[in-house]
Amino acid sequence: MQPLIDYARSFRQQTAARPEEFARLAEGQAPQALFITCSDSRVIPSLITGARPGELFELRTAGNILPPYDPEQPTGEAATIEYAVEILGVRDVVVCGHSHCGAVGALVRGDDLTAVPAVRDWLTHAAPRADGTKADGDPAIADAAQSHVLAQILRLRSYPYLARRLDAGQLRLHAWFYEIHTGTVLAHRPPADTFVAHPARPVRAAPP
């Protein structure tokens, strides 16, 4: 913990080199995308995308799970999505799953989650394996995690305000998958119904 505290103490001095950027952020935000991903500490949206402060509106949940739309039972997840789209006018929504996912792995293996009832109940919102079989190992978990991302994309389409914008061509949904062990970001391609690596492009240099 101490290294984190030390960095926080010095952050003000580090930002002093870019006063205009941070002053501009105080005037408001206009993020390019809503980035929905897992709470896993190994998945860092700004690191994966090279986003600067103010460019991503983030929603992180255990297993990048989204609850079903229910106007009678509002959730923090639904409120975050609604705010990003209806108030901030975000036109792109990314759901990014990842390899070695603990939540999906627990579902695939059929782990006993009695000791963590909140986790157990939250995972009921996830997409189980379509074939209902128990599998294990990184490839099986990766396959299930990719299917899970697509299930969450489908769930987003059931949110009425998102459906309206999708029908009007005002919103795009993106299904991504991040390989922790390689750093590769895959995107789902509907025609082939497969996840493929993003084509290489010049990389924006990281800030000093």
Positions of PLM-derived features:
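Structural motif
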Residues: 32-34, 55-57, 91-94
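Catalytic core of membrane glycerolipid acyltransferases/transacylases, capturing the structured
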Residues: 41-62
